[in-house]
Amino acid sequence: MFRGKLRTAAVAAVTVVSLCLGGTVAAAADPIVDTGQALGSAVASNGSTLDHVTVVDPRHLTLHVFSASMQRVVPVYVQRPADTSVPRPTLYFLDGQVRREKTDVEEFLADQNVNVVSPSGGENAYWTDWKSPDPVMGVNKWKTFMTQELPPVVDAALGTNGVNALAGMSRVGTAALQLAIAAPGLFRGVAAYSGCALTSDPLGQLFIKITMDNYGYGNPANMYGEADDPAWAANDPYVHAAELRGTELFLSNGNGLPGRHETLDGPGIDGNVATLARQIYAGGPIEAVTNYCTHRFTDRLGELGIPATASFRNSGTHSWGYWQDDLHDSWPVLARALGV
């Protein structure tokens, strides 16, 4: 029985490198930061390529990647490894700027020898390929971007070692599992926090529809078609769970009840009573739904004999404080997948 609570008293993921010769030597300078130029260039099979690089500071840069499938340039935020002297693995952390602003992912992984790559723009489109252009969302081919267009560009530009893992929360947690299934072997590890990996289940479809309707996103019929369209099942991680065999997996969820972050000084609350109330009355029911989804998905993995680390909290809403906790708890699984 692999289901259980992951109780990590401390995450020993930060390594301080010092030489026994009596001093501390800083890592070699990053040539990308120094020159503003990528280490190499690559063109995906469909013509997608790196447009240009923006250096933000000594550890951070933005790759501007042209997507041939969507005919747009996508910003991809990057935190470089602590030591860039040799090729390093890559953690794809979805979605872009907002995840970096709402969690401590950059600080938490600052001392790790891993590229943290956060593409931006596909969250509201579920990071998937839509069947039809949408009046609101336009052309969405995010699965193509994440599995065929972006990886070769990232590997060449950053000089990676080709080892990847993927993490996402909420609807992006669903996408993380879908992407790993769509490209076997591309991502050696996946962490999905509070996702609903039941896209062809009526409750899962309703969850997607409500999310899009409430937040003004596109029409889900343009994504996978009407409710009985085979595309819903074709993109359902539950249906295709067997294809995750051999992938390091971390799944987490709260149960929707108020917990330790439902306080006025909780993450993202900033003393705002209305924000706290919304986190409880909206984030609670949403987390209860994803809890159902995650339990069913872990049950399915168990039936298939596929190992996974599952963390089910006895409280917690659909909110950033818990996802930051989940990131910390999932790091041993992701680190194992990345070989760091």
Which stretches of residues belong to each language-model region?
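Hydrophobic core
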Residues: 14-22
